[in-house]
Amino acid sequence: MKAIAIATVNANCLVTLAASVTAYVPQDVVVFLSGSRMIFPRHRTVVMDNDTTNFGDAYNKVCKAAFEEFDEIVVCNDDIVFTPYTWQTLSEDVSKLKGENIPLGWVACRSDYARGYQNIRIGKGKMEWFRWETENQIIQTEVIAPICAYVQKDAYVDFLPLNWYSDDVQCLMMQEAGKSHFVSRAYVHHVGSQTCGFDATNLIESAKPVIKEHRPDLYDLWFRKT
């Protein structure tokens, strides 16, 4: 893991993310940053303009730039905070899964603002030092959000030009290509919804035409009333 790919629009939380990367991520990791001219203090930073209009296209652009130099990257939202253990734990989990010869899709960090088992509030078993027992396990799942997530170049599939549902569609397309997704033991704090906002109705309606055009099967499954 030698590269981080970040896309931002308003950069509201970017200073905090940069501080945590500076403190906790190895210095030989390269940061690819779209949408800001900020240079991370201790890391080589490759900056580029973000001329896109949605999450999917923004991350396709910055990931493509990172993949020109590296075969595996960590995709990060601009509103997360690393802990002292995030990078090491994620790296350990990726190495373990590679050792099991699993065709990897995403290996995603847990968070306090995510869905399903990716959310630290959703767990099973007894509590161990303020954590659910399952938080110390790598869990296979169908869909993750790449809030902070590892992916290989040969596994990556372009996001559709979406804000909402981009994760769902892309994860499914990667599964269709034979890849498996996992939730790591690693954790990042996630502020959440800093770019797209909280207007769920508008975000859903905006996604429908794109999904209908590119994946009518999913449109029928998710939106067509019976």
Residues covered by each model-derived region:
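C-terminal catalytic/acceptor-binding lobe
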Residues: 161-226
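Short beta-strand-to-loop element that shapes/binds the nucleotide-sugar donor at the catalytic cleft/hinge
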Residues: 105-122
